């Protein structure tokens, strides 16, 4: 798939912009704080209905406007798909093929993107929350059902935490509702964990040969989804549910004492190992960067395997963060397969073959010129 054109209205520092893209490589050049990252973010938001930079949607709307609009024409194997996302202070509304989607979880998945920005190099050494968000965003692109389950889990988790707070402060003494909320949480938590386990195994399958290639065969990458659950079959929904019930039974008094849910997928993590050693703790910066790059490149093949289309790759000021060898490996891997957007302050360092087939855009103060 590829984006044929994009139109922005009142998005960040863009008053209005219309762009036609090449279906292979598009390079966006400009000084810092001119709007390069905003353009990349707009493509990502069109795809995911949320930003990778902020959870406050109001920041996406131009300061003097009431709403922002992103429109794009996505080309797939079976034809063109117009997409539109309107962001207002009341919320977001998305259209696919001119049809308004009742839920954003139904909207997500029509356009698949992979964002690789400098902060993604912290995927390995960052907090568990960073890695959980990575899993949730990437699984959601290929599984709308997962987004629904995750949203439901977060809703029930919030309700359960609220009730635990009431028990903690003795505003409530009857624990019957806690049992009801626990049963509801367990059912959906099991679904979330199973999907994360399956995704982690798929990601490892694709990331291992990529990592081996970058490390010249010297390193083996393995992934482990880390959860406090103790189950013999990690993909058995009923066994995971039983394990959660047992955990919550043991934690009940401690949860009431603290007023918060102490077990569940919201506390899980993904661990990365290189040659059997935890790369977050013991890996060099080079190994950590190779791991992050391998994971991002693995997503390309994983998404293609799931939906039969290659996603769009967004490289936001990340090439300058990679040494020549890793940069060359990245560009060689995607060449000819994936529509790619690259932002940079200078074309120095980008190989001539990539530039030869690229559409070139210059951005200054929210204005774009091809």
UniProtKB/Swiss-Prot annotation:
<dbReference type="InterPro" id="IPR003395">
    <property type="entry name" value="RecF/RecN/SMC_N"/>
</dbReference>
<dbReference type="GO" id="GO:0000731">
    <property type="term" value="P:DNA synthesis involved in DNA repair"/>
</dbReference>
<dbReference type="InterPro" id="IPR027417">
    <property type="entry name" value="P-loop_NTPase"/>
</dbReference>
<dbReference type="GO" id="GO:0043590">
    <property type="term" value="C:bacterial nucleoid"/>
</dbReference>
<keyword id="KW-0742">SOS response</keyword>
<dbReference type="GO" id="GO:0003697">
    <property type="term" value="F:single-stranded DNA binding"/>
</dbReference>
<dbReference type="GO" id="GO:0006260">
    <property type="term" value="P:DNA replication"/>
</dbReference>
<protein>
    <recommendedName>
        <fullName>DNA replication and repair protein RecF</fullName>
    </recommendedName>
</protein>
<keyword id="KW-0547">Nucleotide-binding</keyword>
<dbReference type="InterPro" id="IPR001238">
    <property type="entry name" value="DNA-binding_RecF"/>
</dbReference>
<comment type="function">
    <text>The RecF protein is involved in DNA metabolism; it is required for DNA replication and normal SOS inducibility. RecF binds preferentially to single-stranded, linear DNA. It also seems to bind ATP. Is recruited to repair centers, foci that are the site of double-strand DNA break(s) after RecN and RecO; recruitment may depend on RecO. A positive modulator of RecA.</text>
</comment>
<dbReference type="GO" id="GO:0006302">
    <property type="term" value="P:double-strand break repair"/>
</dbReference>
<feature type="binding site">
    <location>
        <begin position="30"/>
        <end position="37"/>
    </location>
    <ligand>
        <name>ATP</name>
    </ligand>
</feature>
<dbReference type="InterPro" id="IPR018078">
    <property type="entry name" value="DNA-binding_RecF_CS"/>
</dbReference>
<dbReference type="GO" id="GO:0005737">
    <property type="term" value="C:cytoplasm"/>
</dbReference>
<comment type="similarity">
    <text>Belongs to the RecF family.</text>
</comment>
<comment type="subunit">
    <text>Recruited to foci following DNA damage; probably interacts with RecO.</text>
</comment>
<dbReference type="GO" id="GO:0009432">
    <property type="term" value="P:SOS response"/>
</dbReference>
<dbReference type="InterPro" id="IPR042174">
    <property type="entry name" value="RecF_2"/>
</dbReference>
<keyword id="KW-0963">Cytoplasm</keyword>
<keyword id="KW-0238">DNA-binding</keyword>
<keyword id="KW-0067">ATP-binding</keyword>
<dbReference type="Pfam" id="PF02463">
    <property type="entry name" value="SMC_N"/>
</dbReference>
<keyword id="KW-0235">DNA replication</keyword>
<dbReference type="GO" id="GO:0005524">
    <property type="term" value="F:ATP binding"/>
</dbReference>
<keyword id="KW-0227">DNA damage</keyword>
<keyword id="KW-0234">DNA repair</keyword>
């Amino acid at each position: 798939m590829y984006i044929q054109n994009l139109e922005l209205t009142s998005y960040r520092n863009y008053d209005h912009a219309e762009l036609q893209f090449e279906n292979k490589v598009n390079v966006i050049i400009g000084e810092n704080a001119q709007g390069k990252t905003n353009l990349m973010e707009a493509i990502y938001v069109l795809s995911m209905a949320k930003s990778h930079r902020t959870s406050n949607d109001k920041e996406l709307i131009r300061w003097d406007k009431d709403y922002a609009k992103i429109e794009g024409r996505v080309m797939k194997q079976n034809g063109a798909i117009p997409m539109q996302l309107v962001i207002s202070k009341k919320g977001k509304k998305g259209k696919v093929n001119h049809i308004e989607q009742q839920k954003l979880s139904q909207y997500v998945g029509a356009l698949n993107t992979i964002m690789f920005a400098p902060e993604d190099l912290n995927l390995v050494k960052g907090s568990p929350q960073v890695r959980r968000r990575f899993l949730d965003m990437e699984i959601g692109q290929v599984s709308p059902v997962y987004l629904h389950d995750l949203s439901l889990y977060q809703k029930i988790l919030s309700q359960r935490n609220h009730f635990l707070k009431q028990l903690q402060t003795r505003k409530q003494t009857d624990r019957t509702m806690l049992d009801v909320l626990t049963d509801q949480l367990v059912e959906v938590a099991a679904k979330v964990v199973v999907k994360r386990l399956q995704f982690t195994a798929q990601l490892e399958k694709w990331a291992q040969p990529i990592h081996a290639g970058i490390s010249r065969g010297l390193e083996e990458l393995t992934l482990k989804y880390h959860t406090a659950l103790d189950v013999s079959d990690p993909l058995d929904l009923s066994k995971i549910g039983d394990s959660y019930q047992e955990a919550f039974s043991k934690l009940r008094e401690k949860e009431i004492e603290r007023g918060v849910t102490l077990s569940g997928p919201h506390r899980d993590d993904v661990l990365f190992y290189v040659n059997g050693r935890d790369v977050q703790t013991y890996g060099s910066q080079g190994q950590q960067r190779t791991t992050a790059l391998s994971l991002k490149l693995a997503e390309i093949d994983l998404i293609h395997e799931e939906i039969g289309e290659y996603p769009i790759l967004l490289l936001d000021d990340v090439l300058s963060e990679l040494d020549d060898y890793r940069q060359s490996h990245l560009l060689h891997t995607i060449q000819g397969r994936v529509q790619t957007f690259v932002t940079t302050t200078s074309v120095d360092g980008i190989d001539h073959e990539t530039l030869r087939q690229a559409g070139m855009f210059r951005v200054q103060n929210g204005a774009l010129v091809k």
